[in-house]
UniProtKB/Swiss-Prot annotation:
Keyword list, A-Z: Hydrolase
Species annotation: Picosynechococcus sp. (strain ATCC 27264 / PCC 7002 / PR-6) (Agmenellum quadruplicatum)
Gene Ontology cellular component terms for the protein in this record: cytoplasm
Family as reported in the entry's similarity comment: Belongs to the SixA phosphatase family.
A GO MF label: protein histidine phosphatase activity
The UniProt record lists the keyword Iron-sulfur: no
Protein's UniProt name: Uncharacterized protein SYNPCC7002_A2622
SMART domains, A to Z: PGAM (SM00855)
InterPro entries from the UniProt entry: His_Pase_superF_clade-1 (IPR013078), His_PPase_superfam (IPR029033), SixA (IPR004449)
Gene Ontology BP terms: protein modification process
Highest taxon listed in the record's lineage: Bacteria
EC number: 3.1.3.-
Length: 165
């Protein structure tokens, strides 16, 4: 199984919105995210599932990935909201055990995505994986089931600047 962590694109300033969850992508954020998604599609990446945080900027990012034909319509997962639960996600992930070759992408927020990737790849977190906006981390598991620090490999960590034309 391959598990990708995709941080939402550049969002509007917090000061302009009463609720953090209402902040949309900026025009620049939308444009950059579309370019990154197009590049991932050109590289032949395709996800069997797109899971997104309920916050607007993450949902918009997930929709961009789906529109670029990288995967199906996104599914909202409350556990991907800021300060979400890795345990709840791993429990949800069990439904994919029958599809060991699946590629799934999680669209969410920092520092959570970086911490989750660290916990799964290394068994601990140390705030070392800095995921830029519209950046992506890829983990591969040799096991039928992804668990924290069990035969998992970090194979991709890239900033959007390396994917933009």
């Amino acid at each position: 199984m391959e598990l990708y962590f995709f941080r939402h694109g550049i969002a509007a300033d917090r000061a302009d919105y009463a609720e953090d969850g209402d902040r949309p992508l900026t025009t620049k954020g939308e444009t950059r995210t579309k370019l990154v998604a197009q590049r991932l599609q050109q590289l032949g990446l395709h996800f069997e599932g797109i899971l997104t945080s309920p916050l607007l900027r993450a949902r918009q990012t997930a929709e961009i990935l789906a529109a670029a034909e990288l995967g199906p319509h996104p599914q909202v997962f409350q556990g991907l909201a800021p300060r979400g639960s890795l345990g709840a996600f791993l429990a949800w992930l069990e439904r994919w055990e029958a599809a060991p070759d699946a590629k799934l992408v999680l669209v969410g927020h920092q520092p959570d995505l970086g911490e989750w990737a660290e916990a799964i790849a290394f068994g601990q977190t140390g705030h070392h994986l800095n995921l830029k906006k519209a950046g992506i981390i890829g983990l591969r598991s040799g096991a039928a089931r992804i668990q924290a620090h069990t035969d998992n490999e970090l194979f991709l960590l890239t900033s959007p600047k390396w994917l933009l034309p």
